[in-house]
Amino acid sequence: KFGGTVDPGHVAAVALYHDATEIFTGDLPTPVKYANPDIQAAYKAIEQNAADRLTATLPEELRPSFSGLLSETDPQVTDLVKAADKLSAYLKCVEELKAGNLEFKKAKEQTYAALCQNPIPALNYFMEHFLSGFELTLDELN
């Protein structure tokens, strides 16, 4: 529908493993990670080191497959994974607010604004056609 050339299965696999290196690095907040080019470059090197360490724990025959998933460089793939990650963060905010946790109000607004700025057609389609359903209660879904 969107004329893309990436393999959706590959994108999904990269998305599943994109945070796996955090078992070694921990989760660095996005504003810190991108505070300046030096920090961003240093963190990329740290993530690559963590990916190498993680891959080294696997049996030899599995390493090539997982190495590619942990170190994806195709911008079409990485842009889709980043968009999905941002969407997931937004949906987490929605769920927290539905549960009464008002600490997520500002994060929801900021994340939504960032999603609206994203030019990926598939993301925009999802937001237009499906996002409102996540705001509904179970009673409203039935």
Kindly label every feature range from the protein language model.
Residues 1-142:
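Alpha-helical, largely C-terminal catalytic domains
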